[in-house]
Amino acid sequence: MWRASNEARLKGSAPPEHDPRVRGHLENPSAFLFVADDAGVVRGMAVGMQGLADDGAGPPIEGLCHVGAVFVAPDRWGDGLGGSLVDAVLEEAQTRGYTSAQLWTPADNARAHRLYTRRGFRRTGRQKRDDLGETIAHYERAL
């Protein structure tokens, strides 16, 4: 799913170097995953997990949920599926006792920026380059 979504967004092939990052999200012991399927075909996914200090390299930050691996099939872009998946992650995060949420998304992905700001996320002004050299922007919100 993530590969099809990224290939459409990047208008080319999604780098295989992203595979370990997505797998890492899914294998994280604190992770909770939501999947949207249509007759057994995955159409979208989103993951929530314990947020960590130092941009994911440090110790857990109490009360912080990291939202990651939000991917939607390109033919479902704009129909609300991504928002429903993010809403499900945020609702589950609250149920688990998280009090805030954060995420990183490509700085040039206007569709993602609209999705997250509609759900109460605000850009913090922090940006960095990910391990593949793409500029990503940080967002957060209270739960």
Predicted stretch roles:
Residues R43, T124-G125:
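Local beta-strand/beta-hairpin segments that build beta-sheet-rich folds
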